[in-house]
Regions:
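N-terminal cap/lid segment of alpha/beta-hydrolase-fold proteins
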Residues: 1-27
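Active-site glycine-rich loops that stabilize anionic/oxyanionic intermediates
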Residues: 33, 37-41
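Conserved alpha/beta-hydrolase
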Residues: 48-76
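Residue in the alpha/beta-hydrolase core beta-strand immediately N-terminal to the catalytic nucleophile
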Residues: 64, 111, 135-137
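Alpha/beta-hydrolase active-site loop
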Residues: 82-102
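Alpha/beta-hydrolase fold nucleophile elbow
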Residues: 105-116
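Glycine-rich nucleophile elbow surrounding the catalytic serine of serine-hydrolase chemistry
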Residues: 114-124
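Alpha/beta-hydrolase-fold enzymes
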Residues: 124-180
Length: 180
């Protein structure tokens, strides 16, 4: 039966604290799986999956990203990463969690699991840090043609300039998620 514990670390923003849940196996661990959740999710949604992995010998760890789950209670705002460079802050926090766990268990294989938005975060992470993971699992990811990505970025940038970074934009939300 897996055990779990919680801890926090200081976010790379310098303003927030990031909530972490860790599930541990009863016996000797055979590896570490770091879960990166999707948009509008939190790490505790992965409890059944994490317990399954822990019951099969893995240490499982995952954080609530900036603006998600219990990280909101520590200086965050729901769904909001940062005024600027928000994506980078989340990727830096992912790296910090990796480093915390790798310091504790330097000899264990390290696996990243990213779902939905978490898959894009993990994809960014492995581009920046290809030497750190031993394996990567990408779930529920996607791909858009470059013109659509550039158009979406232009729309988002214009909306931030017009309304500010904290405004929830229904038009942009519908364009981004309407098909889902």
């Amino acid at each position: 039966m897996a055990n779990f514990s919680d801890f926090y670390f200081d976010s790379s923003t310098g303003k927030n604290r990031i909530y972490v849940r860790q599930w541990s196996p009863e016996g000797e661990p055979r590896g570490i799986v770091q879960i990166e959740h999707g948009i509008a999710e939190h790490i505790e949604r992965y409890d059944d999956f994490a317990r399954f992995l822990a019951d099969n010998g893995f240490i499982v760890v995952g954080d609530d990203h900036l603006g998600h789950g219990k990280s909101i209670d520590n200086g965050g705002e729901q769904g909001f990463f940062a005024e600027s460079d928000g994506w980078d802050y989340v990727v830096w926090d992912i790296d910090r969690l990796h480093d915390i766990m790798h310091e504790k268990y330097p000899d264990l294989p390290y696996i990243f699991f990213g779902h939905s938005m978490g898959s894009f975060l993990v994809r960014t992470y492995i581009i920046r840090h290809p030497e750190k993971p031993d394996a990567v699992i990408i779930s529920g990811t996607g791909h858009q043609p470059l013109p659509m990505v550039l158009g979406g970025l232009a729309m988002a940038s214009a909306a931030v300039k017009l309304y500010g970074a904290h405004k929830i934009g229904n038009t942009l939300n519908n364009v981004a998620f309407g098909a889902y």
